[in-house]
Amino acid sequence: MSAHTRITRKTVTAIRSTKGIGSLVSLTAYSAPMAKLVDEVADVIIVGDSVGMVLYGMPDTLRVTLDMMIAHGAAVVRGAAQACVVVDLPFSTFQESPAQAYRSAARLLAETGAQAVKLEGGCEMTDTIRFLTDRGIPVMAHVGLMPQQANAAGGFRAQGMDPRSAAQVFDAACAAERAGAFSVVIEGTAEALARHLTETLTIPTIGIGASPACDGQVLVTEDMIGAFDAYTPRFVKRYADANAVMRDAIRQYAHDVRQRVFPEPAHCFGYGKPLQLADAATAA
């Protein structure tokens, strides 16, 4: 690639236009180095509030703050060159009113450089999504299993498994589309429901524990590569065991330090050369 070749970042319009064409690849990232790696293949990078559990050891996502999302979102934007970057609106920063959601979303986009925000919610969020999209803030909706509402739902339980629950998820996704969302994440739902939503909606569906029929898939990267093992959802496929690789490297380093075989000459400056010290008068 020449020095003059310019990489164009995928826009929300481009993402929306993929409906029914191929399959969108989406992963999470919370740092610039991870974003750079994921950016090689991803169409969409989601800076999820899952950062609280994955990086900070929190028991859930409820303690994640807007400032945290801004810091991690900005890092991801710096690391990613071509993927569309979407940042989560964390708990308590958008539920109070559309105006509150706008203030939070405006800060996220202005201070991170991301392309869109993602928010969890059912039909009660319809007015908020419309308020944001009417004011130029692209929104990715999130329906089905919603981690921010896990307490009210009695835990992390699959949704849409009975007719009433399925209707609620279906109505929420359709309402989000009508309100202007450019795509929707469908998490932890009955496969038939996710498939039906994908066939019904005119915006891309991105599944996580949903259906292979969705217009795209997303996983938490640390789950997928085996770097986070505190809890593994049943819908995660592990493609590597990063923890094992890192653990072996750390143990080898500790062994080499204790045996004084690290650092080697190649890791030192002027190894083997005699010490030369200027006297105090000369140095002054």
Curated annotation (Swiss-Prot):
One GO MF term attached to the UniProt entry: 3-methyl-2-oxobutanoate hydroxymethyltransferase activity
Residues the record marks as active site: 187
Subcellular location: Cytoplasm
Cofactor(s) in the UniProt record: Mg(2+)
Chemical reaction(s) catalysed: 3-methyl-2-oxobutanoate + (6R)-5,10-methylene-5,6,7,8-tetrahydrofolate + H2O = 2-dehydropantoate + (6S)-5,6,7,8-tetrahydrofolate
GO CC annotation: cytoplasm
Chief localisation class: cytoplasm
Keywords: Cytoplasm, Magnesium, Metal-binding, Pantothenate biosynthesis, Transferase
Pathway connected to this protein: Cofactor biosynthesis; (R)-pantothenate biosynthesis; (R)-pantoate from 3-methyl-2-oxobutanoate: step 1/2
Residues annotated to bind 3-methyl-2-oxobutanoate: 49-50, 88, 118
Assigned EC number: 2.1.2.11
Annotated positions binding Mg(2+): 49, 88, 120
GO biological process: one example: pantothenate biosynthetic process
InterPro entries, per the entry: Pantoate_hydroxy_MeTrfase, Pyrv/PenolPyrv_kinase-like_dom, Pyrv_kinase-like_dom_sf
Source organism superkingdom: Bacteria
Subunit structure: Homodecamer; pentamer of dimers.
Role noted for this protein: Catalyzes the reversible reaction in which hydroxymethyl group from 5,10-methylenetetrahydrofolate is transferred onto alpha-ketoisovalerate to form ketopantoate.
Similarity field: Belongs to the PanB family.
Name the UniProt record assigns to this protein: 3-methyl-2-oxobutanoate hydroxymethyltransferase 2
Protein species of origin: Burkholderia cenocepacia (strain HI2424)
Gene that produces this protein: panB2
